[in-house]
């Protein structure tokens, strides 16, 4: 055991929560001093002969280049960022109106004939992210066990992994956990998994935090040819590092581990294994408490999410009462937040774990008028619409991913005449969402099997959830 490690252990003052698994007393030091004996099939990482990336050809530092990649607006004042985003959203809406004006039977003009309200600023500008994923790859010094974000592309073969310590959007707690995980995998005898067919095991880490500082870490691991017993040794070492070793300074509340041979997979495809701590962390939004699982969707900026949900609630005020359809509902944040002003809320979500969280959240907050359904919206919604009563009216709120809504979802919404108002939340309105806008507003018969009355845009509000980046959420209201 190194003297530095002994010193850090002697000076740890953070309280250690109760462990979930039993760990051999001296396992971590055993791994450090006996790396080759753990798994003979895994060669220690050699960095002395690794090719180092060329220095930047410009005068920018690696840190500046990463900031320009991840947070391109970081050099601007926040007021200038908001103005830039407002003008960008205006251009997108003008593009939408130009496309809608091509419909020969609709009286759309090619200019903005509905109000674009002022952009809603984020209450917090720095360190706002409650979820960050740090990748593993070759660093500036050539070390393949470097945690951070990428500069370059795999296609060009010039990827460099740069530490994220300087990025404005990431909180210090996330940076601390990432640095500790980097330290751990550098001490481990297992190689990093950079390319699946090249072998290696340690992959990225995702860190989730809430506003009170509770922290969940999810470590991703490629088992390759390791036996379950061999993998268990490294899982135990990981737990010991974050509870009794230098990583204890992170004070993790939850430590999860996912073994997978795929780039991305759900909890259903490969179970998240709780190695240590609590099963969930919790966050409060607009007075409601929400449970967060390892893979459940939750807006990355809590304070700005509150502003977003308030905006959606205000734009839904004319339709108070009746039923709210919350499509792509995630953990139920929007539906539960709007539940006091609705008679009934029905949420639809693809990820089963998120639906379980949504149901739990409704019960936790004693909200009795919400129900949540798991499945693809394009499968669930058409059948659901036929069983809904139009008494009291129907309001739809849709919050899809960047892929937008499936055509069958739009068709079901269009063809149900009781829906008079639809609130569309998009983080990328100039992407696939633009197709949805056309489908919602096009003439009857112009798109296959759409027979319902067309919508028209009536008001738009940008909400900044992502300071220092070009992105924001656009809330666009359609009526008919």
From Swiss-Prot:
Catalytic reaction equation(s): uridine(54) in tRNA + S-adenosyl-L-methionine = 5-methyluridine(54) in tRNA + S-adenosyl-L-homocysteine + H(+); a uridine in 12S rRNA + S-adenosyl-L-methionine = a 5-methyluridine in 12S rRNA + S-adenosyl-L-homocysteine + H(+)
Which Pfam families does the protein's record reference? tRNA_U5-meth_tr
Entry keyword set: Methyltransferase, Mitochondrion, rRNA processing, S-adenosyl-L-methionine, Transferase, Transit peptide, tRNA processing
A single Gene Ontology biological process assigned to it is: tRNA processing
Query: Record's GO cellular component, any one?
Result: mitochondrion
Q: Where is the active site?
A: 427 (nucleophile), 473 (proton acceptor)
Query: For this protein, what is any one GO molecular function term?
Result: rRNA (uridine-C5-)-methyltransferase activity
- Give the binding site residues for S-adenosyl-L-methionine: 299, 349, 399
Enzyme Commission no: 2.1.1.35, 2.1.1.-
Give yes or no: UniProt keyword Isomerase: no
Q: Which EC class does it fall in?
A: transferase
Compartments where found: Mitochondrion
What are the boundaries of the signal sequence? none
What the protein does? Mitochondrial S-adenosyl-L-methionine-dependent methyltransferase that catalyzes the formation of 5-methyl-uridine in tRNAs and 12S rRNA. Catalyzes the methylation of uridine at position 54 (m5U54) in all tRNAs. Specifically methylates the uridine in position 429 of 12S rRNA (m5U429). Does not affect RNA stability or mitochondrial translation.
Q: Which family does it belong to?
A: Belongs to the class I-like SAM-binding methyltransferase superfamily. RNA M5U methyltransferase family.
Protein name in UniProt: tRNA (uracil-5-)-methyltransferase homolog B
Q: What organism is recorded for this protein?
A: Danio rerio
Lineage in the entry? Eukaryota, Metazoa, Chordata, Craniata, Vertebrata
